[in-house]
Amino acid sequence: MQIYSEYYEKIGPRKLRLLVKRRLLFASTWLYINNYILLSIIMKLQTKHMILLGFVAVVVVFIIFMLTRKKKEGFSIGNIFGKVKGAVTGTVGKVVNVVKPQGYKPEFVNRVNFGKFWACPEGTTDWGSEDKQCLVSQYGPMMWRNKGGNEWGWSCPAGSAPNNSDDWNQKCVQGYSMKKLIDGQWRCTDTEIDTGKDWSNSDWFTAQQQCDRGNNKVFTRRMYIDGKWQCPDGTWDTGFTWSDGENGGKQCKYYP
């Protein structure tokens, strides 16, 4: 302090004030320039690099944290990428399953031998095809068939009714038929149940479910028509009679 005091005494008051002003001006200028440079850097980082630097910082902190965990967890950088890859592929698989769901797959079985002929087992419906013989499932596809009078087209086999579905394999529901003109009356066969549905009280689909065949989808019995016992329209006589034991009720087979 003495040295500085002696120096300031030598230069005089006027020169001292001038020196102080110069140093203050230099200090303020230097501080202004530093602040300007720092603010410029911060502004550029905010617009271009702050997000990236923040993400890098989070990743670095996460990796450091995971590396400090117990070795028994078997953590490594490779495990991170493996988990990420598994998560991504698993998500894609779920999306594919949503976009392409499994369609309805009806079940079919083959016809069996009844001694005199081959026919579908009871509880199924003859689908009139060699590769799709007897429908077990509730729903099935339309078939290219003779709809009557040598008129061919896509339709549901006899013993099934059209179903209101966009799935081709669910276009037909088995176990239903239309009433037939039997002995002058529109009625169901003796083994069918009248559902009460008709064109006056049902839509186009359910109106064709007039007779429920229940478990008797393949065979029915002879009916007293025109003064004699005979098979109704839409069936053919199998030759079985009540004396044939368990086959006694299989007197008339429905056409597919």
UniProtKB/Swiss-Prot annotation:
Keyword Disulfide bond assigned: yes
Hydrophobic: annotated span: 24-44, 47-67
PTM description: Stabilized by 3 intramolecular disulfide bonds.
Keywords recorded for this protein, A-Z: Capsid protein, Disulfide bond, Late protein, Virion
Intrachain disulfide bonds: C120-C134, C156-C172, C188-C211
Transmembrane region(s): none
Location(s) in or outside the cell: Virion
Domain of life: Viruses
Chief localization: virion
GO cellular component: a single term: viral capsid
Written domain comment of the UniProt record: The hydrophobic regions might anchor the protein in the underlying inner membrane.
Assembly and oligomerization: Interacts with the major capsid protein.
Function, as annotated: One of the minor capsid proteins that constitute a network internal to the major capsid proteins and outside the lipid membrane. The minor capsid proteins glue and stabilize the capsomers.
Protein name as it appears in the record: Minor capsid protein P7
Gene field: A262/263L
